[in-house]
């Protein structure tokens, strides 16, 4: 079991993580969601050993057994896809027939075999993210940390990336990933919702839905603008305590509604 316990991280006067505990079991995917500045990247970087804790503990494998794909993962632009993979694989001692087989397997899984000889500089954004994923997992890590692996990529590449994530977990790897796509988060075994460095809720998708209190309504004109947000062409409004006035349509909240509503509760608590 990998993860962080009571993790606290400060950047100057800013509390980036505030007493955060997250467990990442082997063979499962834990998805971290939240708005900008929620602490998602800080949590992942802390577990990857890139950011020191000011308090709490980390349980992580040695560097040789850890795979990490940062939000701005870089490949070597002047190297081909194959050369990028081989360079990273060599750091972990993969060579010869073992490397050849592993490279071919991952290129096929990522639909990158036709691009194996292409310079990384000439790849699309989605192809670069898939290459970064391969470089993070080529050595079969025990813990795989992915910072928004599918942000900004095309729909087909998103499908490829999620398949790769699922296959990694199925092989026994513990996967911790942040994502801006809540449909991806819903597929994870566990969700962690962060806001301003604090956990608002965590658990399985079903547990998060079942534990959500209050009512969400749909309206063209919200009664209280500070509790409302746009959802497509309409607005949703959260009623954490007393129910809405008569005549307002109540809707079943989805994960996006829950994340926004909990964030609004947190921010109104801070302001009060």
Predicted feature descriptions by range:
Residues 33-35:
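The feature captures the beta-strand-to-loop junction immediately N-terminal to the Walker
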Residues 48:
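Helix-to-loop junction immediately C-terminal to a conserved catalytic motif
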Residues 86, 90, 97-115:
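Conserved ABC ATPase "signature" region
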Residues 137-138:
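ABC ATPase C-loop
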Residues 78, 119-126:
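Conserved ABC ATPase signature
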Residues 2-4, 17:
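Conserved structural motif at the start of ABC-family nucleotide-binding domains
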Residues 144-148:
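Catalytic Walker B motif of ABC-type/P-loop ATPase nucleotide-binding domains
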Residues 160-239:
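ABC transporter nucleotide-binding domain
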């Amino acid at each position: 079991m990998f993860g962080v316990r009571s993790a606290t991280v400060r950047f100057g006067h800013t509390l980036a993580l505030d007493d955060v505990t997250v467990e990442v079991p082997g063979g499962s995917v834990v998805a971290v969601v939240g708005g900008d500045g929620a602490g998602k990247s800080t949590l992942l970087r802390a577990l990857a050993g890139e950011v020191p804790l000011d308090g709490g503990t980390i349980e992580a494998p040695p560097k040789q057994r850890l795979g990490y794909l940062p939000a701005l993962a870089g490949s070597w632009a002047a190297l081909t896809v194959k050369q990028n993979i081989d360079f990273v694989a060599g750091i972990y001692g993969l060579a010869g027939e073992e490397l050849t087989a592993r490279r071919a397997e991952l290129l096929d899984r990522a639909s990158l075999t036709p691009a194996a000889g292409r310079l990384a500089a000439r790849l699309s954004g989605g192809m670069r993210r898939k290459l970064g994923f391969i470089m993070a997992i080529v050595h079969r890590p025990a813990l795989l940390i992915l910072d928004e692996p599918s942000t900004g990529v095309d729909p087909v590449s998103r499908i490829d990336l999620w398949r790769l994530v699922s296959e990694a977990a199925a092989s026994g790897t513990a996967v911790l990933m942040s994502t801006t796509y809540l449909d991806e988060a819903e597929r994870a075994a566990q969700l962690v919702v962060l806001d301003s460095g604090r956990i608002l809720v965590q658990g399985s998708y079903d547990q998060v839905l079942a534990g959500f209190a209050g009512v969400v309504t749909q309206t063209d004109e919200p009664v209280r603008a500070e509790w409302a947000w746009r959802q497509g062409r309409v607005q949703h409004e959260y009623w954490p305590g007393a129910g809405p006035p008569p005549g307002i349509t109540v809707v079943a909240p989805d994960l996006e509604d829950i994340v926004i509503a909990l964030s609004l509760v947190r921010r109104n608590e801070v302001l009060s």
